[in-house]
């Protein structure tokens, strides 16, 4: 895993986004951001029915994929999402921990393909396919 300043700055920027902090997002392994994230299913993440809001899982699956992709980006590159498809497989109740891992399937010159899995109590609760465009940083 790269240990350079750009990598560290990108991870710090992701962790510092107020929305991510509000949701309680944390790295699964602070020494390896590509290992994914986790968050508690608490009041800010619930829908009116008292279950995990789908928008939260969509957003954080995208974040996990970006964290997995960072190590594949050059210092002059950034990645933006242009396609995100999520299948919600089962509802998630309050007071659960959701772990999300992202995996880079293929990094091309201009496009990166990833997948993410959200897991609660050992069961996959959501699966995503994420496509990001690789663009010049700036």
Predicted feature residues:
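Terminal targeting signals and extreme-terminal segments of soluble enzymes
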Residues: 1-138
């Amino acid at each position: 895993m790269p240990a350079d300043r750009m990598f560290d700055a990108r991870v710090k920027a992701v962790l510092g986004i107020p929305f991510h902090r509000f949701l309680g997002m944390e790295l699964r392994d602070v020494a390896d951001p590509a290992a994914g994230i986790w968050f508690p299913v608490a009041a800010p993440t619930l829908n009116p029915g008292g279950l995990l809001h789908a928008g939260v899982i969509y957003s954080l699956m995208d974040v996990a994929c970006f964290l997995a992709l960072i190590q594949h980006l050059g210092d002059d590159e950034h990645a933006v999402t242009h396609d995100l498809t999520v299948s919600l497989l089962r509802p998630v109740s309050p007071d659960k921990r959701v772990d999300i891992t992202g995996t880079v399937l293929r990094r091309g010159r201009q496009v990166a393909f990833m997948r993410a899995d959200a897991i609660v109590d050992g069961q996959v609760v959501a699966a995503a396919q994420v496509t990001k465009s690789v663009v010049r940083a700036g």
